[in-house]
Amino acid sequence: MLRLGITLLIGLLALPGVAVAEPPLIKPRLVVLTDIENEPDDTQSLVRLLLYANDIELRGLVATTSVHMKQGVHPESIKRVIQHYAQVLPRLRQHDRAYPDAALLLARVVTGQPGYGLQAIGDGRDSPGSELLLRELERPDPRPLWVSVWGGANTLAQALHSLKRTRPKAAVDAAVSRLRVYTISDQDDSGAWLRREFPGLFYIVSPGSYARPTWAAIHREIEGIDNQHVSNAWIVRNIQQGHGPLGAAYPDIAYGMEGDTPSFLGLIPNGLNAPEHPNWGGWGGRYELYTPRREDTDPDGFTGGVPVETETRPIWTNAVDRFRPVVPAAYGRPVKAGEREFNDALVTLWRWREAIQNDFAARLLWTTRAPAEANHAPVVRLAHATELHVRGGDWVTLDASPSSDPDGDSLSFLWLAYPEAGTLKAPLPLGTEVQARIGLRTPEVDAPATAHVIVQVTDKGTPALTRYQRVILHIEPKAP
């Protein structure tokens, strides 16, 4: 959640402080389409998602098919996980009263198209899932409607097919403009159809084979980094065993851990995520808007049998970050720059993975522990606005010292330049900065540019929890 502070210091001149009201948290609204029972990872992702039901409004949970499960849907499996959630709900509400009733969630479990792909959509083929999507699209709600697609997308395709057949074009365009879709690759042939038939549809996807998608970074073992937080041993110790009925409902891995989770990670209000700006990066990865070439999507690799079509227009898809992780230091500053630099699309997600996993583990502990016995995330606040207007060559002070921790834990700070999120070509002069308050001199520019700086604040509780604040520097050329 973006929070506003009170002052900006540039050079030696302090501008007058102006109190700014903290904006209310607006929960994203989400409908999930899941081919649950195709493999265990959908159940794994659902366990995690329910722990964030206080932060994300779950408007529908739709059981669907996919190329991996072409016939039959399993709403009963969704309901079974919600029943485990019901057992721990009283304890969760000790940590946050916003957790919804299990009965409310159960009432939002419906079935989608009973068959596979485009062959299961058309006139007269509406399903409870497609009807739910239509109702949500036409609700008088100013929030976008996010649809996370963990399997096939044909229930969404049916909803938009019916919308197009029964509403005037202006109403269709207005409804589509409110949609935000994130699909875990294309798991049936309706995804490419949706992108082609509705060119204005906001769509995040890594088309092509499963070898190259950004979402795979949630579980993939990356050479040269510490992968313990996605190991089987970590999952047993922190999730499955001794963590109550919801943790016990988390199944063992069959192929990859939680391949569907990236579709909602970017909606969690952590100060870093900016759902309307996939190119800014966040827990769900970073994506750029362009038309990918078919040959760059590994079309001959494994897709489960879904044909890889040529994209006809720009979509939000794989982007590349250049990233050098920090590593712990025994003396002096607590962290130092690592020796290895990484440069690919997977980096955009796994760079946050330790924090993602620790957050999951902490929330699962909420299901068995009283608030005084559990850890809660720090609250990151700035002593200035989140967007600063400066000129090239200015000295800028960035200050997160008003940050605090609800449990009274000690806090560690790390400031990160995120060049890929902005337009500034020159590097920011920012090293391994670990103080709450830092200064830097902005590069000189010939044209207006933006630079993103992230402050990462981590407590020293167990497990250690991290929150962020993003500062956007709007840099103008020096005055003539």
Residue ranges and their predicted role:
Residues 458-464:
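Short, solvent-exposed loop/turn segments at the edges of extracellular beta-sandwich modules
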Residues 465-476:
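C-terminal edge beta-strand
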Residues 5-16:
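Bacterial N-terminal signal peptides
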Residues 441-448:
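Short, surface-exposed loop/turn segments at beta-strand-coil junctions that are enriched for proline
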Residues 22-397, 403-424, 448:
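N-terminal acidic, glycine/proline-rich low-complexity segments
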Residues 192, 476-480:
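Low-complexity, Pro/Ser/Thr- and charge-rich linker/hinge segments at domain boundaries
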Residues 416-441:
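Surface-exposed, flexible coil segments in extracellular/virion-facing regions
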